[in-house]
Curated annotation (Swiss-Prot):
GO terms for biological process: rRNA base methylation. The lineage of its organism: Bacteria, Bacillati, Cyanobacteriota, Cyanophyceae, Oscillatoriophycideae. NCBIfam families: 16S rRNA (cytosine(1402)-N(4))-methyltransferase RsmH. The gene is rsmH. This is Ribosomal RNA small subunit methyltransferase H. Residues 275-299 are annotated as: Disordered.
Amino acid sequence: MSKVLQMSTVNSLAFIHIPVLTQELIKGLDICPGGHYLDATVGGGGHSRQILETYGDVQVTAIDRDEVAIAAATTNLADYNTDRLTFWTGNFADYDPGNLKFDGIIADLGVSSPQLDSPERGFSFRLDAPLDMRMDRRQSTTAADIINSYSEIELANLFYNYGEERLSRQIAKQIVKQRPFFSTTELAEVISRSVPPKYRYGRIHPATRVFQGLRIAVNQELDSLESFLAKSPSWLKTNGIIGIISFHSLEDRIVKHQLRASPLLKVLTKKPIIPQSDEQAKNPRSRSAKLRLAQRKEQ
C-alpha cells in the first residue's frame, strides 16, 4: 500500500465535510426512480448520500481527484450496495463515461473544509505546513515549486488572474526577493509584510487571495473546470440536469458562461441560487456558494 493510500485510510474518518445547498441541489436535480447520477466531486459523500436516499434504486457514480476524499466517501457510504455506487479516482476533466448516460450531474467546486483544515495538505495560511496544496497528491507540482521557480512577472500575473489580488506586483516582488519558501506560515508572513499596514489587519487576511491563486494554479482548477463543462453536457440523457456549485467569482463566471454557451443545454437558473440565512449561520463557509442549473435539451 502506498504512503498516500495509507494516509487516505488513516484520515478518511476525519474527512467530515458539510455539503452546501443540499436541499436546493436535490430539488433542482428532480431525481427520478431508477436514475443514474454522476457526483463529479464526491468529497466526503454528503451530496451522494442525499441522492441515494431519494429512491432505493437510484445509482451514483462518484469521482474525486483526492484519494483521501475517495477513501472517506467509501467509508461514509459503505451501507449502500456496490451495485448502486461506483467510485472513480481522478480529475473530473479526465473522466470518460464511455456510452454511459446520466440523469443528472453535480459538482461542488473548490477546496473542501477537510482539505483546508488538514495541516499536512498546506492549503491554509493559518496552519503551519509544507507549501503543498495538491488535491491529487500523485501529481508532482506543489505550491512550493511554483513560488520558488516562477519569475516575478509570472507570480504577479498568477496572483492577479487567479487570486484577483490588486497588490500582486508588490507581493510578487517581495516573494522573489526573500525566497525560497517551504512553509505556509513563512509565505503568509512575507505577504503580510509586503502590503501597506491598512491591509494587514482588515477583514480579509492579506494572504487569502494569494493562496487562492496558488491553489488554483497548482491544481489547474479553472482549466479543468472549462474542460469538464465542455464535455459533461453530452453525458446527460435528454432532460437530464447538471448542477454546479461554485465558491468564487472566477468559477462562477466560467460556469455561467459555459452553461449558457452549450448548444445542448437550457439554463434553468437566471440568477444563481444562494444558501438561505439559516444555512449560512450554521455553516459560515457556505456564504459564498452559488448554484447554477441547466437541463439537456430534447434532440
